[in-house]
Regions:
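Aromatic-rich, lipid-facing transmembrane alpha helices and their immediate juxtamembrane interface loops
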Residues: 1-283
Length: 283
């Protein structure tokens, strides 16, 4: 009979330490798996993956815990573990995608280019891989890891280690969330800059048309004046863009690298132009 907690977990603190360390282990293993998978697909070492700054993807850790808890450590039939594991982990991924989109108004990943996807949040390929990972987790990986953690509990190291890791984990979450919020705010400012420039350009176009139709003033003189104003408006916009770029922090930059398909819900065009501008600054 499977029991999620070993017999040594007799207090809430010990149960927390055991659960949190499992979460950390599978989050790190998940991050390693994603790095290997993405690097193999690109045939080169890919940019660091994940929302957090550390080598960790909590979505994998939470997915592993959900599978272990809901399947009582795994079904006797590996095929059933595969099917249920695929469903459970896909549910975790879908909910995470939806929640992060609502929180930050950005689409962090999109599987629309894959066949058999659901709203671009989950796809059959990943669900199949998650199902296989669930079989490996329940029938091979978790038993020895659980034994190792039991020894760690017995040694008295598990509780202080879990508290230290919790402090680091929460700090990482705060910094990453702050970076995402700042990135969202930066896109709003970028949208305003391009909107202001567009309004000025439209006003100048209207003025130029009026001059051409009226023929009351020398066209050359007004053409030179409009060209100067246009150049001034563009220079002002470029200056604001440089200020936005110079004031972005390392956490914002990392998020853009970690999520190549990151898309803003409210400002998709601003996100596209921002990425293009960043690429031009790199050259």
């Amino acid at each position: 009979m499977f029991s999620f907690f070993p017999p040594l977990c007799t207090t809430p603190l010990l149960k927390f330490a055991y659960t949190f360390l499992l979460l950390m282990i599978y989050s790190v293993l998940g991050w390693c798996s994603e790095m290997i998978y993405c690097s193999a697909g690109q045939r080169k070492l890919c940019e660091k993956r994940g929302f957090l700054n550390g080598p960790i993807c909590p979505i994998y850790g939470h997915g592993a815990l959900v599978v272990l808890l809901c399947l009582d450590g795994g079904c006797k039939n590996p095929l059933l573990t595969f099917l249920l594991g695929a469903v459970l982990t896909s549910l975790v991924e879908y909910v995470t995608s939806y929640a992060m989109e609502k929180l930050f108004h950005m689409r962090w990943w999109d599987y629309s280019q894959y066949k058999f996807h659901l709203n671009g949040r989950v796809c059959l390929l990943n669900s199949t891989l998650f199902g296989l990972a669930s079989v490996f987790l329940c029938h091979f990986a978790n038993p020895p890891i659980a034994l190792w953690l039991t020894d760690l509990l017995a040694s008295g190291v598990a509780v202080p280690l879990s508290l230290i890791l919790l402090a680091v984990y929460l700090t990482d979450i705060v910094l990453s969330v702050r970076g995402a919020v700042q990135l969202s705010g930066r896109l709003a400012k970028l949208h305003a800059i391009y909107g202001e420039l567009s309004e000025k350009l439209e006003a100048m176009k209207a003025e130029a048309r009026q001059i051409v139709h009226s023929k009351l003033e020398p066209l050359t003189e007004h053409g030179s004046e409009l060209a100067a104003r246009l150049e001034s408006a563009r220079a002002e916009a470029q200056q604001k863009l440089r200020a936005l770029y110079d004031h972005q922090n390392v956490f914002e930059r990392r998020l853009l690298h970690s999520f190549p398909t990151l898309r803003s819900i409210h400002y998709p065009e601003a996100m596209k132009k921002w990425k293009e501008y960043i690429e031009t600054r790199k050259k």
